[in-house]
Structures are given as C-alpha cells and as structure tokens.
Design a protein with these regions (language model features):
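Positively charged, small/polar-rich N-terminal and surface patches that mediate targeting and assembly
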Residues: 1-122
Length: 122
C-alpha cells in the first residue's frame, strides 16, 4: 500500500480530480496549501507597498492506494496537471504501514481498495 501525495497548481485541481475519477481512483483528501518550489519570485504592490510573495497557493491531494493502483494514479495526475511550466507541482509516493477503515474496522487492502477482495489485474 502507498500514500500518494500530489501538490499541484490550483488552476489544475479540477482536471486532476476528473482524471482521478476517470482512472477509477476513489477515496482522497484535497486541501488548499501554500508552498514554494522552483517558481521565480512574485512581487506585488499592496496599498502602495511592494510585497514579495514568497509562497504560492497550491492544492494537495492525498490518496491511499493498493500497490496495483499506484501507476494509474500517478499517470492520471501527471497527464492532467502537467503544463510544461516551472512550479507545476510534485508527486510523492510513500509506503503505508497500516490502514484502518473506521466505519467497519477493515484493515489494509480491504480498507483502501473499493470492491476488494477482487483479483488484482495483471
């Protein structure tokens, strides 16, 4: 099992969400966050004062998936979030030790994969 964390630009969030649903990825958390990556500095004027904007608005997706869903999930995010510009975002794939579904008490694969136990593809 893995936790996929993707940080994308807010203007690409709807496209990413749609691509994840099309890839049959279910069960995710979306948060508005701020961060700074490889973008150039942005300077704005506010009430006559020049302000250096060091943090950019971003959207964070957190998706717990079984191992066979990692590649389709990452591909959906890459294809929908990529613009070719600097600062588009990052995807992190992290190992997950244990998952519990609070409602049923199911654990691990049964807690993250809809319809489990079905035969895994491939």
């Amino acid at each position: 099992m893995k936790l996929i964390v993707a940080i994308v630009r807010p203007e690409r969030a709807n496209e990413v969400l749609e691509a994840l649903f099309m890839a049959e990825v279910r069960g995710l958390t979306v948060s508005r966050v701020q961060g700074h990556g490889g973008e150039t500095e942005r300077v704005e004027t506010y009430r006559g004062t020049t302000v250096k904007m060091e943090l950019q608005d971003k959207v964070r997706f957190e998706i717990g998936v079984s191992d066979h869903f990692v590649e389709p999930t990452v591909r959906a995010i890459l294809d929908s979030a990529r613009t070719g510009d600097v600062g588009v975002g990052k995807i992190f794939v992290l190992p997950v030790e244990r998952v519990y579904r609070i409602r049923t008490g199911e654990t691990d694969q049964m807690a993250v994969t809809p319809g489990w136990p079905e035969e895994e593809p491939g």
